[in-house]
Amino acid sequence: MKSLRSMFAEPLSAYLDLRRALGCRCEEPTFHLRSFDAYACQRNHTGPLTQELALAFALSNPKNSTNYCARRYQVVRHFAEYLAIYDPTTPLLDPKILPHSQARTPRHIYTDEELLRIFDEARSLSPKNPVRGLTFHAMIGLAASSGLRIGEVVGLDRGDVDLKTGMLLIRQSKFGKSRLVPLHSTTLDFLRKYAAVRDASFPDCKEAAFFIHSGQRRYARNTLQRVFVGLAFRAGLRGPKGRGPTFHDLRHRFAVKCLVTWYKAGIDVQGMLPALATYMGHVHYTDTAYYLTATAELLALAAERYQNWLDQGEVVS
């Protein structure tokens, strides 16, 4: 990797090549290890990768959050484990320094009424360019009804969307996996409507992307996120400053909606988690549990099921 310049450049490059060969995602480690390489150069560091160097790098920017610093440290620590195999002078770094907090920001589970308000705001975007509002409506609706990640939405190509069978092909997503995602009938109908308007508006467009802007190019994920935040603000769901509901919260809504549906139908929710994990593109179904936020509706349904269980004469031990 030509941009690496520290004394660790060669093993860093070999380490990242190994991760890629093993099928591991490398975007975040590459980013942090490039920064580590630059930091080591800045300090004119020579000698082994020490605990002090790794910790100083992790804490080098006082503006970073505690969790972000912890992540930087852990990435370097894993590299040090690799380095120790070839360089016995490399110490094993303490895994308990800068522990990553397990606390997560509570997610916002959009109600149907809140989603409708966002859709209304989307349709009012750019009155002189109605395709723009329809496009954002379609992208947001697809994420809400199918649980797609924001990168998966903007990454869809026309060939990935089968408007006849209602099937999406999600290619090489977050964990390097591809999967098929069946669409709800109402979502399919809306995507057909969008595709018809798009093709009529841009009949000579050669762009492969399914969702395009007026420049006849694919939307960037940052653009979709930024516009969505603005729509949520105008819909009264966010304040002018600070954190509020995000596009990714649509994915949480989808998972919770699935859970509520299964509870109401009397289906074994635990037994369905592997299927939901596959649908959402998780490697392990335990990752899916993060999305199953305890909403008031879920708690009420769980309490009702538990009461029915007691009424049937089961014994609690």
Across the structure, where does each feature detected by a protein language model lie?
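Conserved catalytic core of the tyrosine transesterase superfamily
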Residues: M1-S317
